Amino acid sequence: MAVPFRRQSKGRKRRRRSHYKLKTPTIVVDPQTGEFTLPHRVTPNSGYYKGQLVLAKKVKKED
């Protein structure tokens, strides 16, 4: 089995790991409800996308 010829330095190891970071998600405000949502997605509560109603909410029947 192969073994590394030399030990990697701390700087080389840290430079490689510098890309292992999390990105913060982009959040936009829904104009209909004022809630924070992800961009380019239908908002689950209002059902609007680009100002048009895409998903109609189901109304529960009360007895």
Swiss-Prot record:
Disulfide bonds: none
Cross-referenced InterPro entries: Ribosomal_bL32, Ribosomal_bL32_bact, Ribosomal_zn-bd
Keywords: Ribonucleoprotein, Ribosomal protein
Keyword Ribonucleoprotein assigned: yes
GO cellular component term, pick one: large ribosomal subunit
Membrane-spanning residues: none
GO MF entry, a single one: structural constituent of ribosome
SUPFAM superfamilies: Zn-binding ribosomal proteins
Mitochondrion found in the keyword field: no
GO BP annotation list: translation
A UniProt-annotated Pfam family: Ribosomal_L32p
Family note: Belongs to the bacterial ribosomal protein bL32 family.
Family matches, as PANTHER family: 50S RIBOSOMAL PROTEIN L32, LARGE RIBOSOMAL SUBUNIT PROTEIN BL32
Record's protein name: Large ribosomal subunit protein bL32
Organism: Acholeplasma laidlawii (strain PG-8A)
